[in-house]
Amino acid sequence: MNIAVVGLSHKTAPVEVREKLSIQEAKLEEALTHLRGYPHIEEVAIISTCNRLEIYAVVSDTEKGVVEITQFLSETGHLPLNYLRRYLFTLLHQDAVRHLLRVAAGLESLVLGEGQILAQVKTTHKLGQKYKGIGRLLDRLFKQAITAGKRVRSETNIGTGAVSISSAAVELAQTKAEDLANRRISIIGAGKMARLLVQHLLSKGATDITIVNRSHHRAQELAAQFPQASLNLQLLPEMMQVVASSHIVFTSTAATEPILHRENLTAALDPNHALMLFDISVPRNVASDVHGMEGIESYNVDDLKAVVAQNYESRRQMAQEAEGLLEEEVEAFDLWWRSLETVPTISCLRTKVETIREQELEKALSRLGTEFAEKHQEVIEALTRGIVNKILHEPMVQLRAQQDIEARKRCLESLKMLFDLEIEEQFG
């Protein structure tokens, strides 16, 4: 078995491609079941965020497993394979392991060191278990990645003052609008991103903020976290009325189709009304046909890169410190993974030795006579089992502890030959 990751991110694909491959949580079980149905995929987990879609898999055949994942992505996004491949990356074995640890640590994020991705990795692990996508290998890998992410944040300063997608969007809005305190601002959506938007808008002096959401209860929960802000709450049917009266609109919903487009904006807006749209959703909430509309400035997540770049240089040194910690975690996982190669051989050897012990014990007890056997069987049983365990213990400990891959393979081959073991290979 080997580990592979196939995916795309803000580094390899623009938002118009990423949004086609975004997998919402409601569709995750179906996607995992579909992937597990391929003949060469044994375990699978999916990280889907606004900046990345990555599929981690344990594959019985590396090349065929990667082809199956690529085929799945092509079908999911309704994208031709030749077109899709130019945006995909594929990492195998230790490179795949290292990549996930870097993702969890925030080193692969658009916003270097941002903390939200660690929560998303935890969610991927939890849902992968719930929907039976994750097995022994990916369970251990994701736990190692979560440990790595926590270590990087606790043992380095990379997370201190890190901007997020939401804070970068607010920063960009302030740059474009100059004074947020005198602007009517609306946020469409009431999830985690919306909460962060409110938090950063308030810190920049915004005072007139309206939340528009499908669920009034969800909007109330958000408003309750900022009692001092007196947030205005509106339901989705009033969305266009709110947009028409706003100077700045942020969109952060889980809608799979655009909710703002040329048609409804043209109908709702006064011809002389100036509006700024900041769309931090993937799939996009603002349609591409909005670009070029008179009086409207529209920005999406890919437009945040300039804001993030200002923050990047000061964080690069901290990222280098984090790399050393990640290598320790990569090595820890690699040692565990490689030790699994010994499991079939050790198990087979123990089974064979135990069979011999039981056979020889039965012969000895029959020669000793029924009365003696019944009286002393437990003692003799414990004696023989103790001898076997003592003989096998030290070689097995040394075998598991052997870090040199080639040396371990030679030891395994020697055991197979010397004891004539017939083993079905489980890990390659």
From Swiss-Prot:
| One GO MF term attached to the UniProt entry | glutamyl-tRNA reductase activity
For this protein, what reaction is catalysed?
(S)-4-amino-5-oxopentanoate + tRNA(Glu) + NADP(+) = L-glutamyl-tRNA(Glu) + NADPH + H(+)
Enzyme category, top tier: oxidoreductase
Which E.C. number(s) belong to this protein? 1.2.1.70
According to the UniProt record, which cysteines are disulfide-bonded?
none
A Gene Ontology biological process in which this protein takes part is:
chlorophyll biosynthetic process
Amino acids binding NADP(+): 189-194
Spell out the catalytic residues: 50
The record's annotation in InterPro entries points to: 4pyrrol_synth_GluRdtase, 4pyrrol_synth_GluRdtase_dimer, 4pyrrol_synth_GluRdtase_N, GluRdtase_CS, GluRdtase_dimer_dom_sf, GluRdtase_N_sf, NAD(P)-bd_dom_sf, Shikm_DH/Glu-tRNA_Rdtase
Record's keyword terms, sorted: Chlorophyll biosynthesis, NADP, Oxidoreductase, Porphyrin biosynthesis
**Is the keyword Protein biosynthesis in the record?**
no
> So where does substrate get bound?
49-52, 109, 114-116, 120
The pathway is: Porphyrin-containing compound metabolism; protoporphyrin-IX biosynthesis; 5-aminolevulinate from L-glutamyl-tRNA(Glu): step 1/2; Porphyrin-containing compound metabolism; chlorophyll biosynthesis
Residues marked Important for activity (site):
99
Family, as annotated: Belongs to the glutamyl-tRNA reductase family.
Domains: entry comment: Possesses an unusual extended V-shaped dimeric structure with each monomer consisting of three distinct domains arranged along a curved 'spinal' alpha-helix. The N-terminal catalytic domain specifically recognizes the glutamate moiety of the substrate. The second domain is the NADPH-binding domain, and the third C-terminal domain is responsible for dimerization.
Q: What does this protein do?
A: Catalyzes the NADPH-dependent reduction of glutamyl-tRNA(Glu) to glutamate 1-semialdehyde (GSA).
| Extra remark beyond the main annotation | During catalysis, the active site Cys acts as a nucleophile attacking the alpha-carbonyl group of tRNA-bound glutamate with the formation of a thioester intermediate between enzyme and glutamate, and the concomitant release of tRNA(Glu). The thioester intermediate is finally reduced by direct hydride transfer from NADPH, to form the product GSA.
Subunit organization: Homodimer.
Q: Which PANTHER family match?
A: GLUTAMYL-TRNA REDUCTASE 1, CHLOROPLASTIC
User: NCBIfam families of this UniProt entry?
Assistant: hemA, PRK00045.1-3
Full protein name: Glutamyl-tRNA reductase
> What phylogenetic lineage does the species belong to?
Bacteria, Bacillati, Cyanobacteriota, Cyanophyceae, Oscillatoriophycideae
Query: What is this protein's gene name?
Result: hemA
